[in-house]
Amino acid sequence: MKLRGILSLMAAFAAAAGLVSGAAADPVADFYRGKTVTVVVAAGPGGAHTKYTQLLAPFLKKYMPGNPDFVTQNMGGAGGTRAANYLYNTAPQDGTAIGILLSDTALASRLEATGVKYVADKFQFLGGADQPLSAFILFKSEGIASIDDAKKKEIVLGSTGKGSQTYTVPTMINAMLGTKFKVITGYQGMGGVYLAMDRREVFGFQGVWESVKFLRPQWLANNEIAVIAAVSLKPLPDLPKVPLVQNMVSNPVDKQAVELMGGNAILGRGWLAPPGVPAERVAALRNAFQKSFNDPEAKAGAEKRKMSWDNATWQEMQEQAGRIVKADDAVIKRMRDALGLH
């Protein structure tokens, strides 16, 4: 009888331990343990998006339940559309594939740009490490110091593709203000555009000003470039006298269109998950991203590399994508007409 009692007591303890273990189990950690999460970067390996991904990857591993590895997969092409289409339609929907897309991803969806096969606000945003402001950045050697100068003389700009702001913004500004920007597409990521500028194949671009400062500091040191106009809702912090394009247009519909373009900064380094990833895994990814951004070592790494560090919450990004998808039809028609999307 004593032996039977001891065995019963042991069984009770084992059952209790099992209940405690079950209660403490983390299905998200269990899923991610031993796995690799692929971060699809909608740009080439030489650009700022890749730099941010590489900086944050070890911190995401640290804070994500199960501590999976995070690896970068560059998927430039079509101005970010290729990567967005992949994440929306082809990538695993289990949380082992996430992405960092371009600021124009949402707008390209609303414009129904060529090749777009996704709906922007269906993505599940995770957060952003920067809110990059855009501008027209040109070599001074071309003698164009203002938008007015660009109305009188053609200048060749580089672009990653027709779905990217490097193409859409100058093309729309040509239609709205009469500038003569000639845009050459097809470069693999902004790294490709920078190389084309180094070789003097092109003489400028419309894109993120902050990226120039840490990817081509020699242009600044040698006083080679001019920033002639900003395409943003607020002035460039370090160049507050650079005029805003939105203040140059008088037509109300054009003004709304420019503001729609300029408001995309919050999506500029936007991390997101495909639409089918389960909610509990998305929540864990969002939490890990925010903890990674707040980590003092991550911030120090950004400062060392002279990278801007300006958080956008996933809620702000989700709301902005929703606003773009619901943008006024008249404004979208004007933008489509300017881009020749008939």
Where do the model's predicted regions map?
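Bacterial N-terminal signal peptides
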Residues: 8-18
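Sec/Tat signal peptide C-region and signal peptidase I cleavage site
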Residues: 19-25
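An extracytoplasmic/periplasmic, membrane-proximal ligand-sensing/linker region
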Residues: 33-37, 221-224, 276-342
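Hinge/capping helix and adjacent helix->loop/strand transition within the periplasmic-binding protein
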Residues: 37, 62-67, 86-97, 105-199, ...
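Extracytoplasmic "Venus flytrap"
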Residues: 38-53, 76-79, 158-165
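A ligand-binding cleft/hinge motif common to bilobed small-molecule-binding domains
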Residues: 103-115, 167-176, 204-248
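Short beta-strand->loop
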Residues: 121-129, 180-186, 216-264, 313, ...
